[in-house]
Amino acid sequence: MLTQVAVAGGLKMYRHVLAFDFDGTLAEQGTVPLALQTALEQLHTSGCALFMVTGRRCAGAQLSSLEDLFAGIVWENGAVLHHIAADEVYLPFGHIGAHLVEALEGAGVPLEHGRATVSTTTPHNETVWQVLNEWGGDATVVHNRGVVRVLPPGAAKGAGLERLLGLCGFSPRNLVSFGDGEDDRSLLQLGETGVAVADAVPSLKEVADVVTTQPGPAGILEALDTYWLKGSPSELPTRRERPIPLGAGAAGTQVSLAAAALVNGNLGVFGDSGSGKSWVTGLLVEGMHHAGYQVLVIDPEGDFKGMRALPGFVALEVNASTIPPPTMVVTLLEAVTVSVVLDLSLFPVARRDDYVAELVDALRPLREHRFRPHWIVLEEAQHFLPPNGNKVSSALLAMLARGGWAFVSYRPDRLVGDVLAKLDHCILTRLRDLEAAQALGQMANQIPEVSLADIPRGHAWLCGQSVARLRPNARRVPHIRHLYKYLDTPLPKHKHFHFRDDRHFLRVEAASLLEFLQCLRTLPIESLAYHQERGDFARWVKSGLGDGILADHLRKLAQRSLRGETLREALVQRVATHYEELHAAR
């Protein structure tokens, strides 16, 4: 939906992790051409992280000084990992068992032995499969240009690189992979963009986003010059499988933002209080995290701490007595798969600016050297970025050129002008204040035939390279203030849950999650079974309480065909645990 921004002059943080197959890709007959060596040195000097991924045995390639350019090397098709800075070698998938090796050799298969794998040549492929079938062991067999490799289960170039990236602190969401052979398929599919050289096998070209016009190392040099090294690099294609859905457009089609647009650019989300801007922001946060991007939400109102319900999302509370230093937040974010909500709702307002300014400074090395977090959301941005500037804006402005920021506010006119000038796109909900609307300038003028003040509740406009009107999707995690409201406070009468069995209504109803839990503990099991078998509980929790997380749990329980008191115990345990988690997070 929105334009992607090219990596130019080292300014953008996206696609700065590059992984190369060796034979046929970097090297020709085992040698890396001098011009390509120079290009790799330039990439390394500019701050890119380089990895080599090869089917060769550990230390089986003559790299000499080139090895110093790589952050890590994946040997033996993913089975052996070398973390160069730590000088550690890992075998994450184990190794081929001795009995299988003996069986292969006993069948007359000539083997080349690695640390974790064995290999032979194509003429022995049928014998290898016969031995595997007779032996009954578990192994992975890969083929590449006349070589047959037998790997431990789970090993592949992509799987090995993913493990090594995590060990080195890098994310696959910053990765571009280069290859030529059959065994490079998982490598190209791991990252954001896959590049195949012109003489790559057809099956690899099918999954590549870019195919060079030159073969082998010349093709790699062509790609590096086109997309990284020249003065005005071309835009590098990114996989289309990572759109972040926002909602239904005017024609009923889905409106999405490309994750690359959020990582490379800066977003403003503006609208009146209660107009839905935090809901839309939450959709994007959930979508980015779900797609594997690391997200940091700076949350002064406590609206996003419910994100802790998502696997891999941590909610960290800052208050007057418990003040985790900014370096602790960065330490949490050093784990590639962890996203963080920083809840400042109980932290004294007068101390927030200093804390957030320190945090932004502390994040700089992680952003510059590991290119993460991919996306940082500053809620209630008007409190931290006033028009006259402050410590936060001073720390922040130098980082905006890299992209990957979102600013959420009901008063964009109260934001420092340098931030507004750096916005690449906006999501706008109803905005009635004239000065706030005027501050958006051309962004607001893109909306046709309607003023910002007249945007209906439940609608939003996406503005930037193109314009789209949408109705936001449902959330994975309900808006936290809505959830808390109905923990103990009664729902409107028409939303109560009315219990019955297969004969009649019981004249018992639940008006809140607490009352629902009490009913589960005391009502006849026949009533609970009646409703659970029909999916009534999950529907009410989703539509009445707006709690999609608990509704999903109840749907999964319904699939287990539980009976009698076992059903009651499972329902009570699930609902009670969820209630306690929400209550503790208030």
Write out the residue ranges for each language-model feature.
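Conserved ATP-driven motor cores of ASCE-family P-loop NTPases powering translocation/secretion/packaging/pilus
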Residues: L400-G404, R411-V467
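Walker B catalytic acidic pair
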Residues: F22, P300, E379-E380
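Conserved acidic, metal-coordinating active-site core of Asp-based
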Residues: G97-G191, D199
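Active-site phosphate-binding/coordination module
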Residues: Q29-G114
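Terminal, compositionally biased segments used for targeting/anchoring and flexible tails
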Residues: V450-R586
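Mg2+-dependent phosphoryl-transfer enzymes with acidic/Ser/Thr/Gly-rich catalytic loops
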Residues: G9, M13-R15, P33, G158-R240
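Short, well-ordered beta-strand core segments
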Residues: L50, I73, G194-A196, V211, ...
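P-loop NTPase catalytic phosphate-binding loop
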Residues: R240-W375, F384-A406, Y410-R414, V419-K422
